[in-house]
Structures are given as C-alpha cells and as structure tokens.
Amino acid sequence: MLRRVPWILLLAAGARADAPVAEPSDPAARAWVAQLDMHVLPRESGYLSLIATSAQKAVVGGRALAVQSQVYYMLTRELPANYLHWLASDDTHILIDGGPVDYFIFHPDGRAEKVTLGRDVAAGQVLVVPVPGGCWKALRLHPGAGFALMANALSPEWTPDRVRIGAGEAWIARYRGAAPWATDAFLRELIGPNFTP
C-alpha cells in the first residue's frame, strides 16, 4: 500500500517556497508540469512532484522509515541544473521522457563519475541511473534538450534531515582532479547558488 506524501516535507528542509517560477518554454514540459502537479524545487532547482511513500517500514539509524518514496523530477531549458546535494538514501533515476541529462556523482571514497541518462544506449547513455546513498550529485540537462522527466525512487524514504544542499571550498578541494572535468570552476558551477564559503 502506498500513501501520498505531503508537499510540506520539502519545505521542512528550510527551502524557500516563494522562489520565482520559470514556466517551461517546451510545450511537452508545460503539459507534464500541469498533469503531474509539479512545483519548482527550492535550492536544488528543477520541478518536483511527490508520488507516494511505501507503507512498509525499516529501522534505519534507530528510527522507523518508509522503505521507499517516489517522486517525479524534471529539468527544463529554463531550469537546466539540479545543484549539488548529498542524500543518505539510495536514489534511482529512471528516464520517462526527454533528455539527455548528465549526472555528476561524487562518491565518499573520493571518486567522481559522469553518467548520461538518455535513450541513445548505443552511444553509452543509460535509461536508469542508480546513485548510492552517501554520494553527492548534480545534474545538467544537455544543451539543446527541451526537458527531461524522470521518476526517482529513494530508499529508504527522503527525510529533510537526511539531505545536504550545497558545499564549499573543502568539498571542491576533496574532488578537484577526481575526473578530467572536475576543475575548480566546474565544481563551483555544480554547487551553483548554494556555495557555502
């Protein structure tokens, strides 16, 4: 049995609800926003709609959490980046429509990888991106793409105390040079407006 998740959970993370909304220019993206009742995700950016949370529970860190929660998430030309954040939960992204999207994943052991979510499997793109819990990640819509709509499954459920948004110089120093693209300037760009000096 699944239950709807209240939108207020996202606001509990200290996010601002009054951020200006950038309406998508792509007609299909506009239709998805309306049909899925999507809202701009404060701080991380992009559009989000909560689907449900599993009624099954698991004990994690001494407390009972739902085994899984699911959301729709979308990037658009107007909101093409999902800024750097860390999740305690495993976060599996499944492409529904549009794309491609680059995922920049930063592992606790210092490794960094780039994975492209898209339909061109022959070119190395993937339809599903599993991001292990405890990793940092940021997403960027490919230039020229109108939007990318994904379904995300978070296991165990998303809770506001199990996410961190943004980073600073120490984080940049840790991942600098971990991949050819991991320059100071690009890592700072992935952090976006959530840079913490």
Name each model feature, range by range:
Residues 20-129, 138-139, 145-146, 156-159, ...:
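Non-catalytic, conserved peripheral segments adjacent to functional cores
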Residues 7-17:
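Hydrophobic h-region of N-terminal signal peptides that target proteins for export
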Residues 1-6:
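Bacterial N-terminal signal peptides that target proteins for export
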